[in-house]
């Protein structure tokens, strides 16, 4: 504490380096009488203003090189930016922080950038006294048993049909298999809108990889969810950074007990990006796909699960087929069967402007009986048997026509 000219005591904030510099100046001043304070005493160190602290927040990225980690901004799609606050990695280790956690903190500002001095909250919880959370990979995976209701309007046929043909549960790993221009993006939008309307407890994230910039804009304007995108005008490395940090963010939320849904468009383009960036293993599959290129995309898609001890992660991803690319076919074949729900879109249905363009015989959810009541399951089973006997185009036309007569799916099933 120092006594100022007004007689008040002021607290001084000096770094060790600044203190050494001040002490060196005092030694020089003691040798120069003209530099001494009245009475011959050394002049006190100048009062230091308290550091310029400001609140900062963001998603923790510990993978950056150097002594500091960074707080990435959602509005910048989790990509590096000039205003990202830095946080010393020794502080990260001290607080046992994990990649992808959302932090609020106080930082000493240096222009636009800040250096975190104190962490206040981690994923919405006070950092002091916060319970130790389990690690995602240590959680027990179970079959989805809690249904995600998508039906949310008489005229929303996409979600009403999905509820009957390929229902989703919390922790589902669903693959939308789609040829070009079959309506996969519209389907993702409808799913997002339904979940936001019916399940406010689910945190919805939309992850767009290598999409056209105008598609990104349309998605952001269509749904009020967290949209993270690396559009087609970005570097391939950006696609990987966004996808992997978004996954880590979702995993941390699940560890803290939250239910999360990621809508990923598309797995095919994500796999292409990894194929381009991965170090060559020396072994190339058909279509020019490196044998190691699909490991990380599979890890991302395979993260979807329901857990016993914590929350759930639902992933609905799209896979492209009939693009004329042998690589895309190989990617689809590698992912086929890795999910526990599959929705196949039909080009012929789309060309006839029949939406949703779902191929009913090729679509469905494994162990769907766990998502329906016994009565519902018997009715849905009967419906599938009826529709299976006709061609896909006729089946979807008939289903949409019948559904339009009823306000709710339950009313429709009761009449079967």
Whereabouts are the PLM-identified features?
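Short, structured beta-strand/loop micro-motifs enriched in basic residues and often containing a Trp
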Residues: 80-89, 152-158
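P-loop NTP-binding catalytic core
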Residues: 109-176
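Short, charged beta-turn/beta-strand-edge "cap" motif at the junction between a beta-strand
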Residues: 91, 107-112, 180-181
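Short, acidic/hydrophobic/Gly-rich beta-strand patch recurrent on exposed beta strands
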Residues: 70-74, 86, 118, 220
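Short, surface-exposed secondary-structure edge patches
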Residues: 89-96, 165, 177
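Acidic low-complexity intrinsically disordered regions
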Residues: 1-82, 98-101, 106
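P-loop NTPase catalytic core
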Residues: 174, 183, 192-195, 200-416
